[in-house]
Curated annotation (Swiss-Prot):
Transmembrane segments: none annotated. Gene3D superfamilies: 3.10.450.50. This is UPF0225 protein VV1358. It comes from Vibrio vulnificus (strain YJ016). It comes from the Bacteria. Belongs to the UPF0225 family. Signal peptide: none annotated.
Length: 167
C-alpha cells in the first residue's frame, strides 16, 4: 500500500504533495502550497521550503534557521480555513501544525499569506494569534470571599493600588 501524504489530505503522497515537491509550478492554490510546505518539513526537504518563500523574503539567507525548524518532530496538520485575498493573486490559509518536543506535544497556529507571481504561488508571511492574557485568579472568586490588600493592584485592572482606586 502506498504511503499516505504527511499533509493529512487522505491521499497518497504520490498523488498529493510529491507532485508539488517535484515541480513548484504544479501548485495551483495557496492551500496546496501550504500543505506541500508542511509535508516538506516532515520529509526534510529544506530546498523546497526555501524555494517556495517569496523572493522578497530572502529565505536563502535564513536557510540554517529553516533547516532547524524542519528538524522538529512534526506529527499532524489541521487546515482551519483557506480564503481568497484582496485579489486573485493573494490567498490566506489558517492552520494548526502539531509537533513533539521533549516528550510534549505543541501546536503552532498561523494564518499564512501567499502571493502568486509569474504563475507561481509563494509563502510571503504569516500572523500568529495573540495569546490570551492571563486572567487574575481573584476575578473567579465571589466578592464576599475576595481578599484584597490595600497595597495590592486593583481588581478593576487599572494598574493602580486598590486603596487609591476601588478600595
Amino acid at each position: 500500500m502506498a504511503a499516505s501524504c504527511p499533509c493529512g489530505s487522505n491521499r497518497t503522497y504520490a498523488l498529493c504533495c510529491e507532485i508539488a515537491h517535484k515541480h513548484h509550478a504544479n501548485v495551483i492554490t495557496p492551500e496546496q502550497l501550504m500543505r506541500s510546505r508542511y509535508s516538506a518539513h516532515v520529509l526534510g526537504l529544506v530546498d523546497y521550503v526555501v524555494n517556495t518563500y517569496h523572493p522578497s523574503c530572502h529565505a536563502e539567507e535564513q536557510r540554517e534557521g529553516i533547516a532547524e525548524s524542519i528538524e522538529n518532530d512534526w506529527c499532524k496538520l489541521e487546515v482551519v480555513k483557506a480564503e481568497a485575498g484582496s485579489n486573485e493573486n493573494e490567498g490566506f490559509v489558517e492552520f494548526n501544525a502539531y509537533f513533539d518536543e521533549d516528550g510534549k506535544r505543541y501546536c503552532m497556529t498561523e494564518r499564512s499569506r501567499f502571493v502568486k507571481e509569474d504563475g507561481l504561488w509563494y509563502y510571503i508571511d504569516g500572523t500568529f494569534p495573540e495569546e490570551e492574557p492571563e486572567q487574575d485568579p481573584r476575578l473567579n472568586q465571589s466578592v464576599s470571599s475576595l481578599k484584597v490588600g490595600r497595597n495590592d493592584p486593583c481588581i478593576c485592572g487599572s494598574g493602580k493600588k486598590f486603596k487609591k482606586c476601588c478600595g
